[in-house]
């Protein structure tokens, strides 16, 4: 029993040393976080959404659903998480794209510096259909898009599943999501698909990877595309 205990201790030390050595060769990617309190992030996101709504010549009115969505977004952006992306999912016209674009404008306004004097943080936002278009018509630009530090994908599920180029069949969004999963790259996705529909549309492999990759924020509220952006609850 004593010998077994010694071997266990040695094995534990060896495992820890090996782990450290491997991590030095392949450092863990730092998760992007806003360096502020959750309450402050909430207020900043709220201001950004109000500005985005006004930009579209709409009238902003708060409601409980939106406040909950903002709280979840602010919490994820300011606290440690294994997820390196967000999935904003729900019905049509209920604020998912507005949330994504508001976050984009907030980053543009805050001018948060990247480490090692690499400029400031910003997120590129593209429509899912444009990803498929780019894959077929400008593959080099598509490859660069796959690897951007921060990417927003709007309307996941509206794009063609496959594109054909000179006899070659590509799956643009699946390939992009696979690469971003492997590299743990910051990704925000909006979609009208439910998690079950995502699994049916993209298959178990991508659905399982998305489960690990993103935190889900569900938009259950009704459409805002009425006379006002939202009505008071």
Enumerate the language-model features and the residues they cover:
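Hydrophobic positions on the alpha1 helix immediately C-terminal to the Walker A/P-loop
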Residues: 99, 103
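Post-Walker A helix-loop "phosphate-sensing" segment adjacent to the P-loop in P-loop NTPases
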Residues: 105-121
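Conserved nucleotide-sensing/catalytic segment adjacent to the nucleotide-binding pocket
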Residues: 119-182
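Conserved glycine(s) of the Walker
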Residues: 93-96
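Walker A (P-loop) ATP-phosphate-binding motif of ABC ATPase nucleotide-binding domains
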Residues: 85
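Hydrophobic anchor at the beta1->P-loop junction of P-loop NTPases
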Residues: 88
